């Protein structure tokens, strides 16, 4: 588990500073940060960058795969809705990528078997009343570990 922070359209200096001071181990970019932003940030730090992409079309997938971020995160767009995007849009992706959006214990197994993501990103499905729920987090961790043992 790495300490990370989600940034949405932050000035490039902010994630660079927090990464370089080792306040966080990786930055997750969820705004309109383009490839120029990512290139600039990569000149300011050698720490891990994850860029989130809202997936609506195959063109969105192609754009994500071309990203210079260390990892890409494919999401349905609006966070915390519990909705998945159209998984049929996802081809076999050759680079490490994260799957997000509407994931919970009830669909983790099918998502991992079908899409083979490098990692999954869970948010609202492991919360109770808007706060992370340790029991739900453990349940999700156990579910992922069981799936990994099957693969």
List the predicted regions and their residue ranges:
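RNA substrate-binding interface of SAM-dependent RNA methyltransferases
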Residues: 15-21
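N-terminal glycine-rich "phosphate-gripper" loop used for MgATP/nucleotide binding
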Residues: 6-8, 31
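Short loop-to-alpha-helix "cap/lid" segments that border enzyme active sites
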Residues: 21, 32-124, 128-129, 133-151
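Short, small-residue-biased leader/transition segments that mark boundaries at the very start
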Residues: 1-2
């Amino acid at each position: 588990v790495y300490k990370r922070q989600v940034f949405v359209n932050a000035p490039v200096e902010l994630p660079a500073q927090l990464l370089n001071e080792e306040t966080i181990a990786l930055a997750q970019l969820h705004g309109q940060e383009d490839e120029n932003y990512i290139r600039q940030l990569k000149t300011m730090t050698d720490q891990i960058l994850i860029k989130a992409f809202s997936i609506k079309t195959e063109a969105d997938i192609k754009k994500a795969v071309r990203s210079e971020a260390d990892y890409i995160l494919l999401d349905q767009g609006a966070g915390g809705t519990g909705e998945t995007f159209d998984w049929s849009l996802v081809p076999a992706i050759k680079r490490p990528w994260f799957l997000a959006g509407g994931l919970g214990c009830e669909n983790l197994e099918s998502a991992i078997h079908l899409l083979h993501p490098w990692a999954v990103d869970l948010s609202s499905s492991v919360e109770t009343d808007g706060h992370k729920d340790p029991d739900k987090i453990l349940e999700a961790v156990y579910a992922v570990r069981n799936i990994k043992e099957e693969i």
